[in-house]
């Protein structure tokens, strides 16, 4: 938990399965949280989808979040790499620590360094009192970058597509957090699972989606399951212009993310 109510609350968005809607979730959650306070979105996925959606398509001449986790002699401060989204209409409330494929090289560079699992946590420490919320995107696989995203966070949410693969990814993500806890790392509280790409045929949910959500509940008893995010081309369109679903007037599609924001705010108060 945050050490002080004045420090940023850090939320990691993690799933060990591709196509889960992680970057979509980060875009929506960070944008919604920016209405509540100053928010920093950290793209910690070398694919850099979040970075591109927020308007930064070429970082060849720019420093990125990769430089903030390098060994001491080459390391930059997070505040040295922060950018405003190109399509910024949020009056500076939402900022971005961008990423590109150089983040993979940075991960390779630190693989033998002691304490490497917490380099992102170390990098964030000097800026925790500059923000109300920090939201971290992560790669869709086990590895040093995902460990860093998890261990830098106070809270964690797991988006996962409504497929068998998605169920496996969600369960594997929960197992990973428990494994890190067993190794005596301080791990974040898991707020719950967001079922994404929930497919419907007209007014009826497809059998596959229904079975996946049932499997999530059975595989992870006691884990909170948020409302699902329906499969929609609207999600893709809003992503590519850097808007949240709420900003686009799609409140029904945004329901799950509004629930996560509410859960995070309550957890921040009650711990």
Feature locations, PLM:
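P-loop NTP-binding core
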Residues: 1-271
């Amino acid at each position: 938990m945050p050490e002080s109510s004045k420090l940023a609350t850090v939320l990691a968005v993690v799933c060990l399965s591709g196509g889960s809607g992680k970057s979509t979730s980060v875009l929506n959650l960070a944008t919604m949280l920016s209405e509540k306070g100053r928010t920093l979105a950290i793209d910690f996925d070398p694919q850099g989808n979040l970075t591109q959606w927020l308007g930064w398509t070429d970082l060849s001449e720019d420093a990125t979040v990769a430089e903030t986790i390098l060994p001491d002699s080459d390391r930059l401060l997070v505040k040295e790499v922060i950018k405003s989204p190109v399509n910024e209409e949020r009056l500076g409330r939402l900022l971005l620590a961008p990423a590109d494929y150089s983040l993979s090289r940075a991960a390779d560079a630190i693989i033998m360094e002691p304490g490497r699992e917490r380099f992102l946590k170390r990098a964030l420490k000097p800026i925790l009192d500059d923000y109300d919320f920090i939201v971290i995107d992560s790669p869709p696989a086990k590895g040093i970058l995902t460990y860093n995203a998890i261990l830098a966070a106070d809270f964690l949410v797991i988006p996962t597509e409504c497929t068998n693969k998605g169920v496996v990814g969600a369960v594997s993500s929960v197992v990973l957090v428990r494994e890190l806890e067993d190794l005596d790392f301080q791990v974040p509280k898991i707020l719950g699972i967001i079922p994404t790409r929930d497919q419907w045929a007209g007014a009826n949910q497809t059998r596959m989606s229904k079975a996946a959500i049932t499997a999530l509940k059975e595989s992870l008893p006691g884990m909170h399951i948020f409302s699902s995010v329906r499969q929609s081309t609207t999600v893709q369109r809003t992503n590519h212009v850097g808007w949240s679903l709420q900003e686009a007037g799609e409140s029904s599609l945004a329901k799950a993310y509004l629930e996560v924001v509410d859960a995070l705010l309550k957890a921040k108060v009650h711990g």
